[in-house]
């Protein structure tokens, strides 16, 4: 697992098994379920565990609280976890690893979207096989409005 052994914040990924259904919930409600480094690492690990569990037939990802699926990266931790070349590399490896786990799992994946699905949350949703959303869900890529570029590998899933 990329970034293993690093100092990470409290992890906020809820993993549940309900019969043949694997559930992964992003739970950082005070930040609209924005992803911390620890959450990215736990997301990849949860998907890897479900991939290796023969009793799981489908994986459903959702946001806790009913107001946001995921608001992307938790920018409040950028100073700590993205302030040096090494920390940026560790962060990017965690995002890429968890996204790869999600894209390549050989079980159907469903993004259950309710509320905000922006930035990295949009990326997570596009890595899933299916996306189901409420009528009031909001999709956006805010970095584009700020003139920030995306890594090419981060643009691949939405374009496929």
Regions found by a protein language model. Give the residues of each.
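CoA-thioester-processing core
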Residues: 98-104, 112, 118-160
